[in-house]
Swiss-Prot record:
Places the protein is found: Cytoplasm
Residues binding ATP: 8-10, 16-17, 143-145, 182, 189-193
GO cellular component: cytosol
Organism of derivation: Rhodopirellula baltica (strain DSM 10527 / NCIMB 13988 / SH1)
Name this protein carries in UniProt: Tryptophan--tRNA ligase
Source species taxonomy: Bacteria, Pseudomonadati, Planctomycetota, Planctomycetia, Pirellulales
Protein keywords: Aminoacyl-tRNA synthetase, ATP-binding, Cytoplasm, Ligase, Nucleotide-binding, Protein biosynthesis
Positions occupied by motif 'KMSKS' region: 189-193
Length: 320
């Protein structure tokens, strides 16, 4: 099966990004043909500084490769290196109803807040559909709140088929594990919007300080506690093995257990868990030419597939 996933280069990944999405879709490279792209064209709707965008794109590539994306198993490339995608966007846009775009979440939310939504945001779902259809993608891993994008993609492909005949592979959404929601430093869902994230990469000492400042309740140390209702324990579970998790749960239930101990434990297991990725990233940072070669090779393969798909679309709609 062919899997497609994109990551926006708009900021550095945090624990929630990793466990809620990145790890899950990287795992799909083992038994599928993976196409993973860095969505720099999409990022232009929010990132307007050229140097920042260039830096973000390279950081996204370094992050994905360090976290386990294997270029011998999957194709990693930059969205703007595939001009066929922007051409396909136009072919799809000529048959896209305005009402469909007006109903899409991102546009509706921005409009509801009284913010100005530009044409880039308005037509964002069409570019996303082109991203998916250009590679004959069969599986697209998404969060529950992103399923609408796949539905829109299928609708646009269906409209094109109705007008010009069968052309595209219709993708299916693979919903990511909703149980993989990661609590932030304040106990809410980890999100940049809440300013409660813990980064995957960065100074270990600084991250440890952030962990030690995680908000807890004011229950006395001697009181027994329910581990399943505690966000520090939920973080610990992400990294520790079954035996370690059970031992920690028993300490919670027994009482006489301070939050300082679990904070130190979270810091230790998370540092150990991400240590190989941090080492890999440092290695890649010292050899950026290799990273560029990986992106170029991924783009070469992606263009071969996209060119074939767009050629079908051109012929079917009368441009060839």
């Amino acid at each position: 099966m062919r899997v497609l996933s994109g990551i926006q280069p708009t900021g550095r990944p945090h624990w929630g990004n990793y466990f809620g999405a990145i790890r899950q879709y990287i795992d799909l490279q083992e038994d599928n043909e993976g196409f993973y792209f860095i969505a720099d064209l999409h990022a232009l709707t929010t990132v307007r500084e050229p140097e920042v965008l260039r830096e973000n794109v390279m950081n996204a590539a370094l992050d994905l490769l360090a976290l386990g994306l294997d270029p011998s198993k999957a194709n990693l490339f930059v969205q703007s290196d595939i001009p066929e995608v922007t051409e396909l966007t136009w072919l799809l846009m000529t048959g896209t109803p305005m009402g469909l775009l007006e109903r899409c979440h991102a546009f509706k939310e921005k409009k509801a807040k009284g913010l100005t939504a530009d044409a880039g945001l308005f037509t964002y779902p069409v570019l996303m559909a082109a991203d998916i259809l250009a590679y004959d993608s069969q599986i697209v891993p998404v969060g529950v709140d992103q399923v609408q994008h796949i539905e829109v993609c299928r609708d646009l492909a269906g409209s094109f088929h109705h007008a010009f005949g069968e052309t595209f592979v219709l993708p299916k959404a693979k919903t990511l594990d909703v149980g993989a929601k990661v609590p932030g430093t304040d106990g809410q869902k980890m999100s940049k919007s809440y300013n409660n994230t813990l980064p995957l990469f960065g100074e270990v000492k600084k991250i440890r300080k952030q962990i030690m400042r995680i908000v807890t309740d004011s229950r006395p140390m001697e009181d027994p506690k329910d581990p399943t209702d505690d966000h520090l324990f939920q973080l610990y579970q992400l990294f520790a093995g079954p035996a370690e998790v059970e031992t920690m749960a028993a300490k919670y239930r027994a009482g006489g257990f301070g939050y300082g101990e679990i904070k130190k434990a979270v810091a230790e297991v998370s540092e150990e868990y991400f240590a190989p990725a941090r080492a890999k990233r440092e290695e890649l940072e010292s050899d950026l030419d290799t990273v560029r070669d990986i992106l170029a090779e991924g783009a070469k393969r992606a263009r071969e597939v996209a060119a074939s798909v767009v050629d079908r679309a051109r012929r079917n709609c009368g441009l060839r």
